[in-house]
Regions:
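Intrinsically disordered, low-structural-confidence terminal and linker regions
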Residues: 1-58
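Cofactor-/ligand-binding subdomain signature composed of acidic, glycine-rich
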Residues: 35-42, 50-157, 257-360
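Sequence-level motif detector for i,i+2 pairs with an aromatic at +2
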Residues: 56, 116-118, 156, 359, ...
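Flexible, low-complexity linker and terminal segments
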Residues: 79-93, 161, 380, 384, ...
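Acidic/polar N-terminal loop/beta-strand segments that form early-domain functional surfaces
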Residues: 124, 162-164, 645-647
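Long, structured ligand/cofactor-binding scaffold of large enzymes
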Residues: 134-137, 141-220
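Non-catalytic alpha/beta scaffold blocks inside enzyme catalytic domains
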Residues: 196-396, 403-585, 640-643, 647-759
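Long, low-complexity segments enriched in small/aliphatic residues
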Residues: 575-663
C-alpha cells in the first residue's frame, strides 16, 4: 500500500546536522530509493515500474539527461531517478474535491514539498477572475478560455510560451510550431536559466552549442576534469561512468567550492564490491572560490603555452582561428591574481598542470557552477581554449561535456524551443508548413518576467515546469505573474506556480513518461535527446492516473486547432492521432533527423551529427574553432560579506522537493540552512546552530531578504556560502545575469548575514 499525503506542512524549525559524508550511493541509496518509491507507489507497482526505467523497451527517466549505456543493467536507474519516477507514478490523486477544500490563498501558504506530495492532477481546473477556488472544467471549455485570451491580444508578442525540459521532442516541435504560427518567438525555456551560457560559448567557439563527447569517450579519456558540478546528487549515474573511466586508467580532477561525497568515493550498488568498499574517484580536488574558474583555466593555458612541446601545433594551425590574440592574453596571466581569484595554492595548480600535460585525451565536464555567473560565457570559452591548445576536440576520449539537467532540455532546443531561432530553421519551417514565421527575437526567461512586470505580456502558457519557483527574484517574479490576464500550466503535479496566478488561471493535467499514450492510430511513443546528443524512444506502460488526462502533443494540437482555426494548413488532428507523422515532419525540417521513424526503431536510438566531434569541422563564422581572449573576471567581495551559491539538496530535483534531508551533506529535517566556512563564521560572529537572515546586496540598492536560516559550519571554500533554492531565489536580482546568455547569476550572490529573530 502507498502512504497517504501529509495533511499539514512538516515542521522544519530545528534541522539536525551531522557533518558531510565521504561516499555516495551503496546500500543507503538503495534503501532510500525503495522506501520513497513504496510510499508513493506501493510494493508491486514499485517493482514493475522501476524495472522499466531507461530500458530499451521502457520509458526514459523523467529526471536528468545523462545517457544510457548500450548494455543496460536490470536496474538502470539511480536514487534520484527512482524518486522522480515515484513522484510521477504515485497512487495519490489531486481531485476537484481537493481544490474545493483549499483556496488558492491557502495553497500559496504551503511549501513546495507539501504541494508536490498531494499526488497527480486528474482534471482540468479553472480559476475564474475574482474566484477563491479552482473548479473543474471540460477540456473544450479550457481550450476556449485560452483561445479567448490569445485572440484578444493586441499582438501575438503579448503571449509567452514557456517550456520545461521534460517535454518530449514531438510535443516541443508542435509547441514551437503553434507559437510561431500564432505569430511570436516568445519561447523562453528552462535552458535560459541553466546551460544557456554553455550554448552561447560553444556556438561561438566550436560552432555547435552542444557537448562534443559520447559516453564511450569517457572510457577512453586519460584525464577528466569535473568543474562546478555535483554528480552524486544531480547526475548519479555519471558516477558509474567515472568509475569505469578510472578502472580504464583515467585520472580525475574535481574543481568545486564544496567537497561532494559522490566525487570522493562511489559505492556502486550494482556490484557487491562496490557496495562494500566503493571506488575513490577524485585524484586531485581543487577547492576553488565561487567564480574563480576563468582565472584558473587562463593560468593553466599560460602554463601550457610556456611548456615546450605542450601545444598541439598541427591542430592549432589547421583547425583554429585567433590563436595569436589568445596567446598574448594568456601569457599575461598573473599568478598572484589567480591565487586571489581561486583561493588555491600554487602547489595545487602545479599538480593540476602535471596531470594535464601527462594526458593525451582530456575531457572537461561542467554544470551550473560554471554557467550561473556574470562572466560564465568567457569562462566556458576559456575552457574551450584549454582543450583546443592540446587538440582535445574531435579526438576519441576528449572534448567538451556540459552535463545537462532535465531529461530532454537539449532535445527541446534542437526542436526549436528558442527565442532567437536561426534563420535557416525558420526557412525550413516556412517551406514545410507554408506560413511565414516571425523573424524578430522573442523573450527569454528574464525578459519574459520583465515583460509581464511592465504589462507588455498578458498571457503566460507553461508546458510543464514550475516557473515561479525556478525563476530568480521571487518577489518580482510573483508580482509579474499576478499582472497577467491568464496563466496556464500543463502539469502532472501540483506546484507553487498554480498558486501564483494571473487574473484567470488554468491547470491542464497531462500524461507522464510512465503512462501509456493511446491515440487514434493506437499506442504511441515519444522521443528524447540526452545530454550527449543521442536520440531514443520512450514508451510508458502504466495506465494513466486519470481518464481525463491528455498527452502534451494532444494538448498542443487541440489548442492550435481552436486558436488558429481554418487559417492553418498544418494537419493538427493528424499529428494528434499519430506521432509518427510529427516525426516525419521533424525529419524534413531539422538536420540530423533524416529517416527519423526508421532510425529511432533501433533500441539504442541514434546519435545526432556533431561536426567538430565527427569530422573536426567547425561551422563557425571563420570556418574554424575560435580561440577567444576576454579579460579575466571574478567576484570581488566587500569586507564582511560572503558569496552565496544556490544549490539543490539530495532530496530534490530542480524545483521538485522529494524530502527534507540532504543526506550527503549531513542535513536532516530542514531546508533553511546556510553552509558557511568555520573560519568565515568565526570572523562574522556566527556560531554553529545560530540563526541568520540572508540579505542580498546588489547595485540597485533593493533589500532582498531570506529570513531564518540555521548556520551550519561546513568545509566550503573561504568567502563562500551555500543554501538551497528555491528558498534563496528571492536573493537573486532579476537583472543580475550572465553577459551574452542572460542566465541568472545564481552562483555568485553577494550577501550579508544578519542575526535572525529566530535566535
Amino acid at each position: 500500500m502507498a502512504g497517504k499525503p501529509p495533511h499539514s506542512d512538516p515542521v522544519q524549525d530545528a534541522p539536525q546536522v551531522a557533518g558531510p559524508k565521504h561516499a555516495a550511493a551503496g546500500l543507503p541509496a538503495i534503501g532510500h530509493s525503495l522506501r520513497m518509491a513504496q510510499q508513493q507507489m506501493g510494493v508491486k507497482r514499485t517493482a514493475l515500474t522501476l524495472l522499466r526505467v531507461n530500458q530499451k523497451d521502457g520509458f526514459d527517466c523523467p529526471g536528468c539527461a545523462w545517457p544510457e549505456p548500450e548494455h543496460r543493467h536490470t536496474a538502470e536507474f539511480c536514487e534520484n531517478g527512482a524518486k522522480a519516477v515515484a513522484e510521477e507514478a504515485t497512487l495519490r490523486r489531486v481531485t476537484p474535491d481537493f481544490f474545493a477544500a483549499h483556496t488558492v490563498a491557502d495553497l500559496a501558504t504551503r511549501s513546495g514539498y507539501w504541494l508536490g506530495q498531494q499526488g497527480r492532477l486528474t482534471q482540468p481546473m479553472y480559476l475564474a477572475e475574482g474566484a477563491d477556488h479552482y473548479e473543474a472544467v471540460p477540456w473544450e471549455r479550457a481550450f476556449d478560455i485560452v483561445a479567448e485570451e490569445l485572440t484578444a491580444l493586441a499582438s501575438p508578442d503579448e503571449a509567452l510560451f514557456y517550456t520545461s525540459g521534460r517535454t518530449s521532442n514531438e510535443a516541443a516541435f508542435l509547441y514551437q510550431l503553434f507559437a510561431r504560427e500564432f505569430g511570436t518567438n516568445n519561447l523562453p525555456d528552462c535552458s535560459n536559466m541553466c546551460h544557456e551560457s554553455s550554448g552561447s560559448a560553444l556556438n561561438e567557439t566550436i560552432g555547435i552549442g552542444k557537448g562534443s563527447v559520447l559516453l564511450e569517450d569517457l572510457y577512453k579519456a586519460d584525464l577528466i576534469i569535473v568543474a562546478g558540478q555535483n554528480p552524486g546528487t544531480n547526475h548519479p549515474r555519471m558516477l558509474s561512468a567515472l568509475e569505469k573511466a578510472k578502472a580504464g586508467g583515467a585520472r580525475i580532477i574535481t574543481v568545486n567550492p564544496l567537497p561532494e561525497a559522490g566525487m570522493e568515493r562511489f559505492k556502486n550498488p550494482q556490484t557487491p564490491q562496490g557496495m562494500l568498499k566503493g571506488a575513490a574517484l577524485t585524484d586531485l580536488f581543487l577547492q576553488i572560490r565561487l567564480g574563480g574558474d576563468q582565472a584558473l583555466f587562463r593560468l593553466l593555458n599560460k602554463l601550457i603555452l610556456d611548456t615546450e612541446g605542450a601545444v598541439d601545433e598541427t591542430f592549432v594551425g589547421e583547425h583554429t582561428h585567433g590563436y595569436e590574440e589568445f596567446a598574448e592574453a594568456a601569457r599575461a596571466a598573473d599568478w598572484d591574481e589567480t591565487l586571489t581569484a581561486t583561493g588555491l595554492t600554487r602547489e595545487k595548480i602545479d599538480e593540476a598542470l602535471r596531470m594535464v600535460l601527462a594526458s593525451e585525451r582530456t575531457i572537461v565536464c561542467w554544470a551550473m557552477g560554471l554557467t550561473q555567473h556574470k562572466h560564465s560565457v568567457p569562462t566556458i570559452r576559456e575552457v574551450v581554449n584549454f582543450l583546443l591548445l592540446r587538440g582535445n576536440i574531435g579526438r576519441p576520449g576528449a572534448g567538451v561535456c556540459p552535463v545537462r539537467g532535465h531529461s530532454n532540455v537539449q532535445g527541446d532546443r534542437t526542436m526549436g524551443i528558442f527565442e532567437r531561432p536561426a534563420p535557416a530553421f525558420l526557412d525550413a519551417l516556412e517551406r514545410e508548413f507554408g506560413f511565414v514565421p516571425p523573424r524578430g527575437h522573442g523573450y527569454d526567461v528574464v525578459r519574459a518576467i520583465r515583460a509581464m512586470r511592465d504589462d507588455k505580456a498578458k498571457v503566460f502558457f507553461a508546458m510543464g515546469g514550475n516557473f515561479v519557483s525556478a525563476s530568480p527574484d521571487t518577489e518580482v517574479t510573483e508580482a509579474a505573474m499576478r499582472r497577467a490576464r491568464l496563466t496556464v500550466h500543463v502539469s502532472t503535479k501540483l506546484n507553487r506556480s498554480h498558486a501564483v496566478t494571473g487574473a484567470r488561471a488554468l491547470i491542464l493535467p497531462t500524461l507522464g513518461r510512465t503512462e501509456r499514450d493511446l491515440q487514434g492510430s493506437g499506442e504511441q511513443f515519444v522521443t528524447v535527446e540526452d545530454s550527449m546528443g543521442m536520440v531514443h524512444a520512450s514508451r510508458g506502460r502504466l495506465e494513466p492516473a486519470s481518464e481525463h488526462l491528455l498527452s502534451e502533443p494532444a494538448i498542443v494540437a487541440r489548442l492550435a486547432r481552436r486558436v488558429l482555426g481554418d487559417g492553418s494548413r498544418t494537419p493538427w488532428e493528424e499529428f494528434e492521432k499519430d506521432y509518427a507523422t510529427v516525426r516525419d515532419r521533424i525529419a524534413r525540417v531539422i538536420p540530423g533527423f533524416e529517416d527519423f521513424n526508421a532510425r529511432v526503431a533501433d533500441p539504442n536510438g541514434f546519435a545526432l551529427p556533431h561536426a567538430p566531434r565527427d569530422e573536426r569541422r567547425f561551422p563557425t563564422a571563420t570556418g574554424k574553432a575560435n580561440f577567444t581572449a576576454a579579460p579575466v573576471e571574478y567576484p570581488k567581495l566587500p569586507k564582511g560579506r560572503l558569496l552565496l551559491q544556490t544549490l539543490r539538496s539530495h532530496d530534490q530535483y530542480n524545483t521538485t522537493i522529494y524530502g527534507l534531508d540532504d543526506r550527503y551533506r549531513g542535513i536532516k529535517n530542514g531546508r533553511r540552512v546556510v553552509l558557511v566556512n568555520p573560519e568565515d563564521a568565526r570572523e562574522l560572529g556566527l556560531a554553529d546552530g545560530s540563526y541568520t537572515d540572508l540579505v542580498g546586496e546588489w547595485k540597485d540598492g533593493v533589500e532582498r531578504r531570506a529570513p531564518g536560516f540555521r548556520v551550519v559550519h561546513y568545509p566550503t571554500a573561504r568567502g563562500c556560502a551555500a543554501a538551497y533554492y528555491p528558498e534563496t531565489n528571492v536573493l537573486v536580482p532579476l537583472d543580475a545575469t550572465a553577459d551574452t546568455s542572460n542566465t541568472p547569476a545564481s552562483k555568485s550572490v553577494v550577501v550579508r548575514l544578519e542575526q535572525s529573530a529566530a535566535n
